[in-house]
Amino acid sequence: MFCFQCQEAAKNEGCTIKGVCGKDDVVANLQDLLIYTIKGLCYVCDKGNYLDDEVMDYIPKALFVTITNVNFDDKDVINWIKKGVALREKIIEKNNLNKEELPYCATWAYETDEDLINLANTKEVSVLAEDNEDIRSLKELITYGIKGIGAYLSHAMHLGYNNEDIHKFIIKAFTKIVDSKDADELFNLAMETGKYAVETLALLDKANTETYGHPEITEVNLGVRDRPGILISGHDLKDLEQLLEQSKDAGVDIYTHCEMLPAHYYPFFKKYEHFVGNYGGSWPFQREEFEKFNGPIVMTTNCLVPPKDSYKDRVYVTNEVGYPGLKRIPVKEDGTKDFSEVIEHAKKCKPPTPLENGKIVGGFAHNQVLALADKVIEAVKSGKIRKFVVMAGCDGRHKTREYYTEFAKKLPKDTVILTCGCAKYRFIKLDLGDIDGIPRVLDAGQCNDSYSLVKIALALKDAFGLNDVNELPIAYNISWYEQKAVTVLLALLYLGVKNIVLGPTLPAFLSPNVTKVLVEKFGISTISTVDEDIKRLVG
């Protein structure tokens, strides 16, 4: 195996024996084969000028399977590969494509599962198939950006929202990745990936807000009640809606975990009296927190950490999430999910063990912040707010991420943190006070709500009469972990945001030459020390 798609790649070079995430070499290689399968499928769709509902349903979900901490189940990944090959063959036949004119990724065949495992173990389908380090780096940058697009698109489609142009871009992009060896063409494609990342984030924002209302300032309880509970983690709001509706008279409470916390900010969910609070923190600490929760846990998406045996029988998965031995939520013929087993399981469990008390405040997405625009603008003009610091993105296991807690603590009192994603857990529970009633930590929501931060920045640019978003008193100190963060980064670069500090390390998949170009064009850098970074970002 060779995998360097996440921030925790071994030695910041790549995992070669087992993933730091927990996936073994078989699953890692099969995920490479799944991406190879998607490339072949996209290639035949492009050559046949073909797109239908089945393709649009399959590709985003299959991409989601390969994101870090989503699927660890070799049998599940094999099934996704088989679906892709069957769909590819159907399109070849339907469009009378000549296989002799197609690349191997669009023509390979298999007879047994063992054939798939053997093919997955070859260089041909791996990241290392591209020998040129810079071309490989650009292709992987685009691929990881598209993986995130696929994930966000899946969420939007789950709510009934879609955009065919995004699907057409994915097909075109993977076709170019197969064909192109031109660094300039691939760099431009990476920037175009940023464009479609923005469109996808906008689509998901529309899906979430039109379905559940605009997030509003909300206090979220961190304590527990004395009833059994169900803990829901991941990102999928539709799953939460179904779980809440099915459990409302069951005598159990529903708690969010990690990236599901922002669900409390949406008006729609406030009607459920048994939707009581958030339990725990970010995903790296789930093994201890899940054990203490005592009740069942529903994983709707990433991030799943390989579970301990002590609570493995309480973990349920749905959507693209997979791990050997975990129970899967049944899906009915009409597409809705049946959470009855989870609910009955919860009734037999003890209430959650308390982890902490108190409350946190969030809900500062674009609509809410722009409603406070006059107050914010006045605070900036009067000098009470000197700078906004975007501290968005992902959390992770590395001890180096303690940097973000210290950075938040040491920021001058006239600065305001704009955040979203699970990176927030490094500082959202700190008492950092407020500026004239404006909290010094404004949480916009999930990682995809980085779109809110962009909308806020663009609105402030217009309000201050500036020509360039980089003229705003906003600094960017972003932490990344998995591929959706790459999608967000490309979106920011496409929008022209410069001087982003990306940490705690730069991606292992960026070659020295590609890194140099990103530094020269966009001023990207990584973290140093807290004091030095506050000096350069805030002054």
Curated annotation (Swiss-Prot):
Pfam families: Prismane (PF03063). [4Fe-4S] cluster binds at residues 3, 6, 15, 21. InterPro entries: HCP/CODH, Hydroxylam_reduct, Prismane-like_a/b-sand, Prismane-like_sf, Prismane_a-bundle. This is Hydroxylamine reductase. Its EC number is 1.7.99.1. One of its GO terms (molecular function) is peroxidase activity. Its cofactor is [4Fe-4S] cluster; hybrid [4Fe-2O-2S] cluster. Catalyzes the reduction of hydroxylamine to form NH(3) and H(2)O. GO terms for biological process: nitric oxide catabolic process; response to hydrogen peroxide. One of its GO terms (cellular component) is cytoplasm. It comes from Methanocaldococcus jannaschii (strain ATCC 43067 / DSM 2661 / JAL-1 / JCM 10045 / NBRC 100440). Binds 1 [4Fe-4S] cluster. Binds 1 hybrid [4Fe-2O-2S] cluster. It catalyses: A + NH4(+) + H2O = hydroxylamine + AH2 + H(+). The modification Cysteine persulfide is found at residue 394. Belongs to the HCP family. The gene is hcp. It is an enzyme of class 1 (oxidoreductase). Keywords: 4Fe-4S, Cytoplasm, Iron, Iron-sulfur, Metal-binding, Oxidoreductase. SUPFAM superfamilies: Prismane protein-like. It is found in: Cytoplasm. PANTHER family: HYDROXYLAMINE REDUCTASE. Hybrid [4Fe-2O-2S] cluster binds at residues 235, 259, 303, 394, 422, 447, 482, 484.
